[in-house]
């Protein structure tokens, strides 16, 4: 039977589950699916049987790599959930799922509190204005501390948590929660079978004072935000539960507060109240309102599309995956209008028409066919040939382009050499399909060695991609050691550089003259744009049809830097002037002139080498602190802070990625296996001269 999407959008929630790698996100999602009736048997992550983790590598590693989408129902409401990965190498999956969500559940480990990846994901959610509720998970774990975790939400995220539930007991004695809205205990005592109903009781005597204190804080916070409620609160009048709920909903949707719940997903405790909160407090598509885009023919004209089936169709493709039977699946969020199976849509990003073969709502990797895709929902489309992540699909009669996504450049690379000619052919297919799925997985040819070089966001990212090539595409290949993705940039402006491209042989010749200026370019915070081109030519001295060719030539030359052939970034190029010839000028001539002008200008602009710097966090017992800091310093790291956390010391530092290979082994041997660390890409920084000269010499065969 086809699963039809709810047409009343007020009863729809598009949410993500987001967290640090081991906070229990996937288990939480599995329990949601069980309690909402989708799963009859619950899969455990540590058994490799989890429904949402459907790739072989995910089942083996016990982590979520891709964002599986699924649909379920709770109390007459439809919840479309995306389970996102918690490992830093897969932040792109988080980023693109947040782009299409209306709300999220942030899951925290009750012992660890806010961890580095939690901070990263939280920042990404803030970037896309995604309202959140918090679920403090693993309350049954040794060392679980709800109040500590809530404090870390304040200290590390700078957020305003609104405590909605208090734990009853902790660790093995965790039995339930105090529901602060209704002032009652909600318990699941002893070993709770999956699917067991909660019991509602009086609040335990030893928790009554604390419950009163937190209830008072809750009411006060909510009342402060509304003049009428505040007057009634100070007059001693009672504010009803429904009034509190309505105001908490407003505050949550505007990201002024973040309601906090707690439980143990693994022990089946606390899931139902959290699901109620998803419905009560997270926005529906109507709350989010119109999506912004621009006219497909004129980027300056803003277009708004309401979440209504009566509007023209518009949707954003946010993920591409390969399904074992159907081939290419394109995950799509529909923002307005609707489209039927077999219908034709326009990919306005690529200006190509696409026909929809089949439409599904997904439950992890199991598909449920639907006849129509409607506004406010998430679907998988089959049959789209040219659509990739970030593309807009729309009505061909009313084209629009929705705001797309920026994807970061890779920070790590490996060379790959197929073992046989047959492997070479299979490798080409594998790379094309995997790059379609993941825009942060890149491929290039090293002109000097002739090797194929794969790029990604970290060692695990590339491990998984290479593993998939072997398993899914049967590619046998030798893999080189990981290499750092260095970049080059300039430090000094060049006010004017003239270059003339001139070639005269028999027949028509080639002629193009360009005068360019070059200067360092500072990208806006949060932007992945690393280049800007400005045209200041007047009076038609370079005809306008040749201007894009100059830009293209400059961008081509930026792929291969001056010092050691690494890509050039953070450059602003201005075309000041030029000249052309009626017969001999062409697009190609101006492209070559732009390319050569950039190379000559960079040589005069004090080029420098850049390297990826990682934000590293080490958690270590105090007695090893000196060793850990000494080791970080020896790796050219800069320690930024030292804090206490749960009886251990936390060292935060920025360290070049090139110095971090093999770090986990060194750290374990220095600390008798008692320390651990995490790292996230932070930024690119200039390589010190002595180190840079070695890198350049190695790259250029000693000609530094």
UniProtKB/Swiss-Prot annotation:
Its GO biological process terms?
A: ribosome disassembly
Gene3D superfamilies, from UniProt? 3.30.230.10, 3.30.70.240, Elongation Factor G (Translational Gtpase), domain 3, P-loop containing nucleotide triphosphate hydrolases, Translation factors
Source domain of life? Bacteria
Q: Which residues form the tr-type G domain?
A: 10-286
Record keywords: Protein biosynthesis included?
yes
Any idea which UniProt keywords this protein has?
Cytoplasm, Elongation factor, GTP-binding, Nucleotide-binding, Protein biosynthesis
Keyword flag Repeat: no
Q: Which cysteines are disulphide-bonded?
A: none
Task: Kindly list the GO molecular function terms attached to this UniProt entry.
Answer: GTP binding; GTPase activity; translation elongation factor activity
Q: Name one GO cellular component term.
A: cytoplasm
Spell out the family assignment given in the record's similarity comment: Belongs to the TRAFAC class translation factor GTPase superfamily. Classic translation factor GTPase family. EF-G/EF-2 subfamily.
What functional role does this protein have? Catalyzes the GTP-dependent ribosomal translocation step during translation elongation. During this step, the ribosome changes from the pre-translocational (PRE) to the post-translocational (POST) state as the newly formed A-site-bound peptidyl-tRNA and P-site-bound deacylated tRNA move to the P and E sites, respectively. Catalyzes the coordinated movement of the two tRNA molecules, the mRNA and conformational changes in the ribosome.
Concerning NCBIfam families, the annotation shows:
EF-G, PRK12740.1-5, small_GTP
Q: What is this protein called?
A: Elongation factor G
Which organism was this protein described from? Corynebacterium jeikeium (strain K411)
């Amino acid at each position: 039977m086809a699963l039809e999407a709810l047409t009343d959008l007020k009863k729809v929630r598009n949410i993500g589950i987001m967290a640090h790698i081991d906070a229990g996100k996937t288990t939480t999602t599995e329990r949601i699916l069980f309690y909402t009736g989708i799963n009859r048997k619950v899969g455990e992550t540590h058994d490799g049987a989890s429904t949402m983790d459907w790739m072989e590598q995910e089942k083996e590693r016990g982590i979520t790599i891709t964002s599986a989408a699924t649909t379920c129902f709770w109390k007459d409401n439809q919840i479309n959930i995306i389970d996102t990965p918690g490992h830093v190498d897969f932040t792109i999956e988080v980023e693109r799922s947040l782009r299409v969500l209306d709300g999220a559940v942030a899951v925290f480990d009750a012992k660890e509190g806010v961890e580095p990846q939690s901070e990263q994901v939280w920042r990404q959610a803030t970037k896309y204005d995604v309202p959140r509720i918090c679920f403090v998970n693993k309350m049954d774990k040794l060392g679980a501390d709800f109040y500590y975790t809530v404090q870390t939400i304040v200290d590390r995220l700078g957020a305003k948590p609104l405590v909605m539930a208090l734990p009853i007991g902790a660790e093995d004695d965790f039995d339930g929660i105090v529901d602060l809205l209704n002032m009652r205990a909600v318990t699941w005592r002893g070993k709770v079978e999956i699917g067991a109903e909660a019991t509602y009781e009086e609040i335990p005597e030893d928790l009554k004072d604390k419950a009163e204190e937190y209830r008072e804080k809750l009411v006060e916070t909510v009342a402060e935000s509304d003049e009428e409620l505040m007057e009634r609160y100070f007059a001693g009048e009672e504010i009803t539960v429904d009034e509190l709920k309505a105001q908490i909903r407003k505050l949550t949707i505007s990201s002024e507060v973040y309601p906090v719940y707690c439980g143990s997903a693994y022990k089946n405790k606390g899931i139902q109240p959290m699901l109620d909160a998803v419905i009560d407090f997270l926005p529906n598509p109507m709350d989010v309102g119109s999506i912004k885009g621009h006219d497909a023919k004129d980027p300056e004209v803003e277009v708004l599309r309401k979440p209504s089936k009566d509007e023209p169709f518009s949707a954003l493709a946010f993920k591409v995956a390969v399904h074992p039977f159907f081939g290419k699946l394109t995950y799509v969020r529909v923002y307005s209008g609707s489209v039927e199976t077999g219908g034709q849509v326009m990919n306005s990003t690529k200006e190509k028409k696409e026909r929809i073969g089949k439409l599904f709502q997904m439950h992890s990797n199991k598909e449920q066919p639907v006849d129509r895709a409607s506004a406010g929902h998430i679907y998988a489309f089959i049959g789209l040939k040219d659509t990739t992540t970030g593309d807009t699909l729309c009505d061909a009669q009313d084209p629009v382009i929705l705001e797309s996504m920026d994807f970061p450049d890779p920070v790590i690379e490996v060379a790959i050499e197929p073992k046989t000619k047959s492997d070479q052919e299979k490798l080409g297919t594998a790379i094309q399909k995997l790059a379609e799925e993941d825009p942060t997985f890149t491929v290039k040819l090293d002109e000097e060695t002739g090797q194929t070089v794969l790029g990604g966001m970290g060692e695990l990212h590339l491990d998984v991609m290479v593993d998939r090539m072997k398993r899914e595409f049967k590619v046998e290949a030798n893999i080189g050691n990981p290499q750092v993705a260095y970049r080059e940039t300039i430090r000094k402006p060049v006010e004017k550089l003239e270059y003339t491209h001139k070639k005269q042989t028999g027949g028509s010749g080639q002629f193009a003259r360009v005068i360019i200026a070059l200067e360092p370019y500072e990208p806006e915070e949060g932007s992945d744009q690393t280049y800007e081109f400005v045209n200041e030519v007047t009076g038609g001295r370079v005809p306008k049809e040749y201007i894009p060719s100059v830009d293209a030539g400059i961008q081509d030359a930026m792929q291969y830097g001056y010092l050691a052939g690494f890509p050039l970034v953070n450059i602003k190029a201005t075309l000041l002037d030029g000249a052309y010839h009626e017969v001999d000028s062409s697009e190609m001539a101006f492209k070559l002139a732009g390319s050569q002008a950039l190379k000559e200008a960079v040589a005069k602009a004090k080029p420098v080498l850049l390297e990826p710097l990682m934000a590293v966090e080490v958690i270590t017992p105090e007695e090893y602190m000196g060793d850990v800091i000494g080791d970080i310093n020896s790796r050219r790291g800069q320690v930024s802070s030292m804090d206490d956390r749960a009886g251990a010391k936390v060292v935060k530092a920025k360290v070049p990625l090139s110095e971090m290979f093999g770090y986990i082994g060194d750290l374990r041997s220095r600390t008798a296996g008692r320390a651990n660390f995490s790292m996230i890409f932070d930024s690119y920084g200039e390589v010190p001269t002595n180190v840079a000269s070695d890198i350049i010499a190695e790259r250029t065969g000693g000609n530094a």
